[in-house]
Amino acid sequence: MPTAKVNDVEIYYEEHGKGRPMVFLSETACDGEVWKINQVGEFSKDHRVIIHDYRGTGRSSKPSIDYTTSMFAEDVAALMDHLGAEDAIIVGHSMGGRVAQLLALDYPEKVHKLVLASTGAHYPQTKGLPLKICKEMIEWGYEKYERDHTILVGWTEEYVKHHPEEIERYLKVRMHNLCPVEFYLRHLIARQSHDTSQRLKDIKQPALILVGDGDRNMTSEINHRMSSEVLAKGIPNSKLVVLPNERHSYFFSNPDEAHRIIRDFIRD
């Protein structure tokens, strides 16, 4: 089981393929396994794909301390040093997109291009633990909350109705290594406390901003559809692409289109 000792924690990682490094960063409290459903097979054809489990998730260490997105970025940067991976394409989904922004800002030599998928720069009114999430988690139970929330946010009602097998295939992977609730909450606090809104102008790398047109379910008054507009306006060399009839999890409901858009971007 490949792990790297970085910043006093053991980080689980995998490498697939050869070529320019391509680092995939998962959403909140999610390990790297989800990328193996579609993305690893596609991009390892011509890239050195690197996935990992954040601290607090999967097979990585789970220290009971406060987490921040800066800490996650430090871990990724140290892992890249360990692997000798520089000038990489960074693909960050949701919270992973927030971590990707910090990599570009604080470790610019490590980042060739950015793909910021279904993400944002900050949560203006909701720091700490959102009350709505806490209530739902208590009422539904942790595992049911995570499962039902993933479906609600991830896909349209039409997709859920007509593709139950695909939904279950994704959930089987997502729920298999579900982290203990303590670390879900630590990740959630880290995500909600993230704020790069005043630093977007300093991101110099080309950035593709990808979002589903229906990605509007969030824990504050600004949703991912809106926050993607903020990113596009704030990052100088950026391009916004909106996927029609998609919500948060188009990497799994419409991978061919997402892959085509990303390949066009990294080819330019």
Predicted features by range, described:
Residues 6-61:
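Conserved HGGG/HGGXW glycine-rich cap/lid loop of the alpha/beta-hydrolase fold
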Residues 50-91:
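Active-site loop/oxyanion-hole signature of alpha/beta-hydrolase fold enzymes
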Residues 92, 96, 100:
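Gly/Ala-rich beta-loop-alpha elbow adjacent to hydrolase catalytic centers
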Residues 101, 105, 112-141:
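Flexible "cap/lid" loop of the alpha/beta hydrolase fold
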Residues 126, 145-199:
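Conserved alpha/beta-hydrolase catalytic His-Asp/Glu region
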Residues 203, 209-211:
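Short beta-strand/loop motif that positions the catalytic acidic residue
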Residues 214-222:
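Acidic catalytic loop of the alpha/beta-hydrolase fold
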Residues 243-255, 259:
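Catalytic histidine-centered segment of alpha/beta-hydrolase-like enzymes
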